[in-house]
UniProtKB/Swiss-Prot annotation:
PANTHER family: CYTOCHROME C OXIDASE ASSEMBLY PROTEIN COX18, MITOCHONDRIAL, OXA1. One of its GO terms (cellular component) is plasma membrane. It is found in: Cell inner membrane. The gene is yidC. GO terms for biological process: protein insertion into membrane; protein transport. This is Membrane protein insertase YidC. Belongs to the OXA1/ALB3/YidC family. Type 1 subfamily. Interacts with the Sec translocase complex via SecD. Specifically interacts with transmembrane segments of nascent integral membrane proteins during membrane integration. Keywords: Cell inner membrane, Cell membrane, Chaperone, Membrane, Protein transport, Transmembrane, Transmembrane helix, Transport. It is a multi-pass membrane protein. It comes from the Bacteria. CDD domains: 5TM_YidC_Alb3 (cd20070), EcYidC-like_peri (cd19961).
Length: 556
């Protein structure tokens, strides 16, 4: 029995089962979305949290066709990394293009549209002020104006400020300010409120992210999905908490938080509202008419007559880059979902990034990190291979015991243990070194799957995107061949059924890896190749048929 191979494949099966179960938790069967009443929306389509009794009378919602026919006036803002459209109706960001991230390898000239406001796909970032008219939430309609329709951050500018001007019927003079910074995906959004009336103004600041009919990236046996949904952080209580779309359909989130953040996630990219660290907000979610929203509403804001006040938040629209997110808000970097071994994955990614700065290619970085990991575990692996070599030496004696005792399993087991003791062989000696390495393999697996740096990153020859499957499926075939070679280095199992299963495994894993990202398959190829070389060396070194022994035998 080849303990290393059996334990390794059992570990792989266990990993696969664990990943499948984890993704089933993240992506449960879709529940029918409950048709929520219009009491959750204002007349301009903004969703508002239930901060008042749910049976209170609410304004009527505009139908989709009425909103479409009302027309929108947009302004465009372009920086070196962002291209956004702002709707002057409420100052919402309704389009967000990421200029440094092409839509695909084939469409290099088309930037990735993270935010968009299309009939088939609506994903926008809202921010607004609202008041309570009795018990009715009423979003204030400022009908903002702008000096220009197009703003652009010039190469010699470090910052661009876009100001929208508006005024409410009750004498509230508002300037909505967007601050864009060179090279940054973070936008400061501020309301400068001036109460020009004669009475105290009391209202709320509301920020939200809304997606309609989102497509969830679900996992299957031949595809690795990534989390698509909402999340939030409540400092001191929940560092990072996912809220799936199915969770929103079942119940509304209602969390009081100081600081923290709310976000909408998808593979590689993220949008997030980050309130001021000392501000107190209520985080909420709503699902209605196939629209899924996560939002944050402030505590009551009061502005005395002739008084000015500034309220605001920060909006991130961009890639999930760990180092960038870590500098924006605590725990925001956890949206780069490395799983339960995130701390180990972070260390491995730092190592990969350091190598990348030297070699300038993420593919070679994967290769070299795999080599370093194998070197780090060389002695443990050697112990495993030595144990296997010792077990192979005992195979004839073990077979003789089986023939002697036939079907008497108790005597076979007793005699086998006595043989192990006599020969000073630990049958489990090869297991522990492998088990110790498994967490590292899992951590690196998630690094390769979740790191946006590998998206559209070329390697060599035809591999032009390490985050996508090999277009010609050459890498999966090579990986299957390396698994087959590993099997050939081991004696066939005594059990015929086990031998058939082991022969089928390379075919099975080739099929499983057929559409896996090239970076993942590359890692397994390098890992398998190094394992083959080490196993061949150790097995040859500790084989009974050593050159020295052959010389002695000849002399006799």
């Amino acid at each position: 029995m080849d303990i290393r191979r059996i334990v390794l494949y059992m570990a792989l099966a266990l990993i696969g089962l664990s990943l499948w179960n984890a993704w089933q938790i993240d992506y449960p069967a879709k529940q029918p979305v409950e048709e929520k009443t219009a009491s959750q929306l204002t007349s301009d389509g903004h969703l508002l949290p239930q901060i008042i009794p749910s049976n209170a009378e609410q304004p009527v919602t505009l139908k989709a066709e009425e909103k479409a026919s009302s027309g929108k006036q947009l302004i465009q803002v372009k920086t070196d990394v962002l291209d956004v459209d702002i709707d002057l109706k409420n100052g919402d960001i309704v389009k967000g293009l990421l200029l440094d991230y092409p839509l695909s390898v084939e469409d290099k000239n088309k930037p990735f549209p993270l935010l968009q406001n299309q009939a088939s796909q609506r994903y926008v970032a809202n921010s607004s002020l609202f008041v309570l008219d009795g018990q009715t939430p009423q979003s204030l309609d400022f009908d903002f104006t702008s000096e220009k329709e197009y703003y652009e951050l010039k190469p010699d500018q470090n910052q661009l400020i876009v100001t929208l001007n508006g005024k409410s019927e009750d004498g509230l003079d508002v300037k909505k300010e967007f601050v864009f910074t060179k090279g940054s995906y973070l936008i400061e959004v501020n309301y400068k409120i001036a109460n020009t009336g004669n009475s105290l103004w009391k209202g709320y600041f509301n920020t939200q992210l809304l997606r309609s009919s989102p497509k969830e990236d679900k996992s299957s046996i031949f595809h690795i999905g990534s989390y698509t949904g909402a999340s939030f952080s409540n400092p001191g209580k929940n560092r990072y908490q996912k809220v799936s779309f199915s969770d929103m359909s079942k119940s509304n989130l209602d969390v009081d938080a100081k600081g923290g953040w709310i976000a909408m996630q998808q593979h590689y990219f993220l949008s997030a509202w980050v309130p001021n660290a000392d501000s107190e907000n209520k985080f909420y979610t709503l699902a209605t008419d196939k629209d899924y929203t996560i939002g944050a509403v402030s505590q009551p804001i009061t502005v005395k007559p002739k008084e000015d006040k500034i309220v605001g938040s920060k909006l991130y629209i961009g890639p999930e880059i760990t180092s960038v997110l870590k500098g924006i808000s605590p725990s925001l970097d956890l949206t780069v979902d490395y799983g339960i071994l995130w701390f180990l994955s972070s260390l491995l990614f730092s190592l990969m990034k350091a190598i990348y700065t030297v070699v300038g290619n993420w593919g070679w970085s994967i290769v070299l990190v795999t080599v370093l990991i194998k070197l780090a575990f060389y002695r443990l692996s050697a112990t495993s291979y030595k144990s296997m070599a010792s077990m192979r030496k005992l195979q004839p004696k073990l077979q003789a015991l089986r023939e002697r005792y036939g079907d008497d399993k108790a005597k076979i087991s007793q005699a086998t243990m006595e043989l192990y003791k006599q020969e000073k062989v630990n049958p489990l000696g090869g297991c522990l070194p492998i088990l110790i390495q498994i967490p590292v393999f899992i951590a690196l697996y998630w690094v390769l799957l979740e790191s946006v740096e590998l998206r559209q990153a070329p390697f060599i020859f035809w591999i032009n995107d390490l985050a996508s499957a090999d277009p010609y499926h050459v890498l999966p075939l090579i990986m299957g061949a390396t698994m087959l070679i590993q099997q050939k280095l081991n004696p066939a199992p005594a059990d015929p059924m086990q031998a058939k299963v082991m022969m089928f495994l390379p075919i099975l894993f080739t099929g499983l890896f057929w559409n896996f990202p090239s970076g993942l398959v590359l890692y397994w190829i390098v890992n398998n190749t190094l394992s083959i070389l080490q196993q061949w060396y150790i097995t040859r070194k500790y084989s009974d048929e050593k050159p020295a022994k052959k010389v002695v035998a000849t002399a006799k």
